[in-house]
């Protein structure tokens, strides 16, 4: 079967973004032999503003806006995202249509000196740009000093190697995809640090009325991952979670059931509201909403209100 018009994938230029774009390109060409796929690379605001915490300059949506404009203007057909960077709302005419199989969703502890969080001496400096990681780390080890860490994976590792940090926390999936797994000293299990919503999964956004693209993307959707991520995202949407708030969540499938764990906390870890829920997989999104409301009733509402007021 021949496909005359090439598919254009909008992507950022960072090594991890390019890995994800090539991953989708390869999957499309494997599913549809003869299909031409081109990459349209672009720089986003999130790539340019590196001296300010994400939460203060508009959150993770900074990494996707330019890609979305390219699709709406017809310069690209689809965009590939790391699911943990995808905002809960989409511009009119665009939507998240495909979620690919999830990589390792855990956080990774990276250090040149220490093997584990428990080995860090009192007052050690740990780098992360995630309020979620900061919150859980400070709750576990209040003595640690958390220092802002921005830039792509290579930049962050360079800063560690330059001695600016005793350790840094990164997503395990990104290190594995960039073949940097040897830098991981230990994995941080969900029991100690719940991942970000959708962490480790790759999502594909496109125009919701583009029948050709929707059809081509169908074989790339991974139903198990999609149900888990939809459950986590439904919870996040109900909490109105953004980059400014420490929210962790992790959904697991157990047969026909889905098990969702989640938390909302103060950035300094002084207060964390946790909860979990189990129910039929077919009700994944309803369960996410249910758990979010439970967390809100148990104290998360006050935490979130305060945090959003602080950022106004």
From Swiss-Prot:
Mind telling me which residue stretches traverse the membrane in this protein?
A: none
Which reaction is recorded as catalysed by this protein? 4 porphobilinogen + H2O = hydroxymethylbilane + 4 NH4(+)
Any one Gene Ontology BP term: protoporphyrinogen IX biosynthetic process
User: What residue range is the signal peptide?
Assistant: none
| Listed EC numbers | 2.5.1.61
SUPFAM superfamilies (UniProt xref): Periplasmic binding protein-like II (SSF53850), Porphobilinogen deaminase (hydroxymethylbilane synthase), C-terminal domain (SSF54782)
Biological or metabolic pathway of the protein: Porphyrin-containing compound metabolism; protoporphyrin-IX biosynthesis; coproporphyrinogen-III from 5-aminolevulinate: step 2/4
Q: Tell me a Gene Ontology molecular-function term this record carries.
A: hydroxymethylbilane synthase activity
- What is written in the cofactor note of this entry? Binds 1 dipyrromethane group covalently.
Instruction: Mark the residues carrying the PTM S-(dipyrrolylmethanemethyl)cysteine.
Output: 243
Tree of life domain: Bacteria
* Keywords carried by this UniProt record: Porphyrin biosynthesis, Transferase
**Needed co-factor(s):** dipyrromethane
Gene Ontology CC annotations of this record: cytoplasm
Q: Which HAMAP family does this UniProt record tie to the protein?
A: Porphobil_deam
Question: What does the sequence similarity comment in the record state about its family?
Answer: Belongs to the HMBS family.
| Quaternary structure note | Monomer.
Task: Fill in the misc note.
Answer: The porphobilinogen subunits are added to the dipyrromethane group.
What exactly does this protein do? Tetrapolymerization of the monopyrrole PBG into the hydroxymethylbilane pre-uroporphyrinogen in several discrete steps.
**What protein name is recorded for this chain?**
Porphobilinogen deaminase
Originating species: Vibrio vulnificus (strain YJ016)
């Amino acid at each position: 079967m021949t496909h005359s018009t090439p598919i254009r994938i909008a992507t950022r230029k960072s090594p991890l973004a390019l890995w994800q774009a090539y991953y989708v390109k390869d999957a499309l060409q494997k599913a549809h032999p003869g299909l031409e796929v081109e990459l349209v690379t672009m720089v986003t605001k999130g790539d340019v503003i590196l001296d300010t915490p994400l939460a203060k300059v508009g959150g993770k949506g900074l990494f996707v806006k330019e890609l979305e404009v390219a699709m709406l203007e017809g310069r690209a057909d689809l965009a590939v995202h790391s699911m943990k960077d995808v905002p809960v709302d989409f511009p009119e005419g665009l939507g998240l249509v495909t979620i690919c199989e999830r990589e390792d969703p855990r956080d990774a502890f990276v250090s040149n000196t220490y093997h584990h969080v428990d080995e860090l001496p009192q007052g050690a400096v740990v780098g992360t740009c995630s309020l979620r990681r900061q919150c859980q780390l400070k709750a576990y080890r209040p003595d640690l000093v958390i220092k802002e860490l921005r830039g792509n994976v290579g930049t962050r590792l360079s800063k560690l190697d330059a001695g600016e940090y005793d350790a840094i926390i990164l997503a395990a999936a990104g290190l594995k995809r960039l073949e940097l797994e040897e830098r991981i000293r230990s994995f941080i299990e969900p029991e100690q640090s719940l991942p970000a919503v959708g962490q480790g999964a790759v999502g594909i956004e496109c125009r919701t009325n583009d029948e050709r693209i929707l059809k081509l993307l169908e074989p790339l959707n991974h139903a198990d991952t999609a149900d888990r991520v939809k459950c986590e995202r439904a919870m996040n949407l109900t909490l109105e979670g953004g980059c400014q708030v420490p929210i962790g969540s992790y959904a697991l499938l157990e047969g026909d059931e889905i098990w969702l764990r989640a938390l909302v906390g103060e950035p300094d870890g002084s207060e964390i509201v946790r909860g979990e829920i189990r129910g039929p997989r077919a009700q994944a999104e309803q369960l996410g909403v249910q758990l979010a409301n439970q967390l809100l009733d148990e104290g998360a509402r006050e935490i979130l209100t305060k945090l959003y007021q602080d950022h106004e």
